[in-house]
Curated annotation (Swiss-Prot):
Family per similarity comment: Belongs to the glucagon family.
Primary localization: secreted
Subcellular compartments: Secreted
Organism listed in the record: Polypterus senegalus
InterPro entries in the cross-refs: Glucagon, Glucagon_GIP_secretin_VIP
Protein name: Glucagon
Induction comment from the UniProt entry of this chain: Produced in the A cells of the islets of Langerhans in response to a drop in blood sugar concentration.
Keyword Secreted in record: yes
Amino acid sequence: HSQGTFTNDYTKYQDSRRAQDFVQWLMSN
């Protein structure tokens, strides 16, 4: 991910339970 793509993805997921899964996915890659 570029910084912009990361920011957009985080914004989409931050208000969802998927935010936690998204962070874990980032950490595992």
